[in-house]
UniProtKB/Swiss-Prot annotation:
Alphabetical list of InterPro entries matching this protein: NA-bd_OB-fold, Ribos_protein_bS1-like, Ribosomal_bS1, Ribosomal_protein_S1-like, S1_domain
Source domain of life: Bacteria
Organism: Chlamydia pneumoniae (Chlamydophila pneumoniae)
Protein's name in the database: Small ribosomal subunit protein bS1
Keywords of this entry: Repeat, Ribonucleoprotein, Ribosomal protein, RNA-binding
Function statement: Binds mRNA; thus facilitating recognition of the initiation point. It is needed to translate mRNA with a short Shine-Dalgarno (SD) purine-rich sequence.
Gene it is expressed from: rpsA
BP term (GO), one: translation
Family: Belongs to the bacterial ribosomal protein bS1 family.
Amino acid sequence: MPKQAEYTWGSKKILDNIECLTEDVAEFKDLLYTAHRITSSEEESDNEIQPGAILKGTVVDINKDFVVVDVGLKSEGVIPMSEFIDSSEGLVLGAEVEVYLDQAEDEEGKVVLSREKATRQRQWEYILAHCEEGSIVKGQITRKVKGGLIVDIGMEAFLPGSQIDNKKIKNLDDYVGKVCEFKILKINVERRNIVVSRRELLEAERISKKAELIEQISIGEYRKGVVKNITDFGVFLDLDGIDGLLHITDMTWKRIRHPSEMVELNQELEVIILSVDKEKGRVALGLKQKEHNPWEDIEKKYPPGKRVLGKIVKLLPYGAFIEIEEGIEGLIHISEMSWVKNIVDPSEVVNKGDEVEAIVLSIQKDEGKISLGLKQTERNPWDNIEEKYPIGLHVNAEIKNLTNYGAFVELEPGIEGLIHISDMSWIKKVSHPSELFKKGNSVEAVILSVDKESKKITLGVKQLSSNPWNEIEAMFPAGTVISGVVTKITAFGAFVELQNGIEGLIHVSELSDKPFAKIEDIISIGENVSAKVIKLDPDHKKVSLSVKEYLADNAYDQDSRTELDFKDSQGPKERKKKGK
């Protein structure tokens, strides 16, 4: 008979409104119990697995966008296909893969898994197990980031810009894709990042190579190197790991101002080893030593006095360099450019690129110097200067320059003489030549002296006439009365111009026999005066005059003139009254 059966399942009650046999009810009860036990076991298992764990799962479905993985939890995880790119070749249904548990259950009750995080975790565990700071690892530079590059060493590591290379870096992109060895500088466990260096390995390799090369290298050996740096004093070459200096003086037998005239960066050169300092790790290189030294037989080839033809290659304030053959230059000093001109700048005579003839003056083989002369190719006009301009010769010359001490005149092109200020006038005290002469004017003068060695000629103008002071005693003996014009008034007297331009002085004490306050009260410039010569001093060119003595000698005439002048000063009426 059908009956209503009531069953309990823990705290739950199940009511079956069905008819069944007693044995069927017992079997169904067992099935329900088994299902309950399995479900409880899965829930307990889910609670034991924590996010962050790496699980093994089975691929149960694959499409172009996702991979479905069963890790034995209550739901399957869906992982983007992009996370399987590196291992997509072995990705098939049923394949076993490791995944990272992000979440055991999201908002929708699904398991969240990651293949990429699992891979990174395993890489990090490998690094910690097998590497430490200072370890050498191999990796590939994958991309450029701010401040440096990212390197794949099994996981991503940071390569700072300062640790990329041991030479100057122009473009970081040039390093992307390169596979190199790196040294681990720092491992940060908390942040899970690694800093590596390529530069330290390169530097260590360079030092090792340098030490090895220093031991192997020998003087006189030929080596190839690449120009890595150019300075004012020379060129540094990379000799396969060791730096060598090619000094500017060892680059060429010619004169160069800067190494860049001969070489450029990254240029390969074959050089000769000149010296090796093993203690300091320095190598001196030579380039010119590979060629014949043109200075070896220079003294035979260019003896002093030989005339040479060359090209002006350089002008400097003190002279001009002339190249007389490849690698051989000589200096024409500014003092050797002209016999007669005072050259201030070489460009007054020659220009760069000019071809000129010169005479070899001297050679300093050890110093690599040749002195040349340009003026020596012409006759020296001073050689016969004494015959051409004998003392006493009268000449007409143009005034070229005026100075405080005299006037320079040109006797012929390049030959000048000096008229000293003391040789300009016998009688006039000249303060400056411009009082008598003007630049550009012609003047007649007489040759006074010629100094061939120092190239000096002196002339005189006053010597064209006799010295009036030699005849002064005859012209103006003491006691003579003279007349002259007042030319200058000073505090001590008045100067009067006499015959032939000679000046005499009326001292203030000799101006009058009457008292006066100022000289100007009794005499003025331009006034004609009469005076008596009271003293002559030809050696010192002085003539002393006296108005007072002149007046005393002519007292009567002076008194008469004074009385007459007084009468003339009275009016006719006054004189008439006086007469009454």
